[in-house]
Amino acid sequence: METATLVTIFISGSLVSFTGYALYTAFGQPSQQLRDPFEEHGD
């Protein structure tokens, strides 16, 4: 394969992995440990 093809595949895979990890952190099991500043603020 050409170098440009390998670089493109690597960058695309990195972006997909980062997006998946971000979604897992936001909506998956670790999201229960995140603090919600809107719930902490009393009206």
Curated annotation (Swiss-Prot):
Keyword set includes Nuclease: no
Alphabetical keyword list: Chloroplast, Membrane, Plastid, Thylakoid, Transmembrane, Transmembrane helix
InterPro entries found in the cross-reference section: PSII_PsbN
Residue spans crossing the bilayer: 5-27
Chief localization: plastid
Pfam families according to UniProt: PsbN
GO BP term, example: photosynthesis
Gene Ontology CC annotations of this record: chloroplast thylakoid membrane
Membrane-topology descriptor: Single-pass membrane protein
Disulphides: none
Domain of life, per lineage: Eukaryota
Function of the protein: May play a role in photosystem I and II biogenesis.
Family: Belongs to the PsbN family.
Protein name: Protein PsbN
The species this protein was found in: Piper cenocladum
Recorded name of the encoding gene: psbN
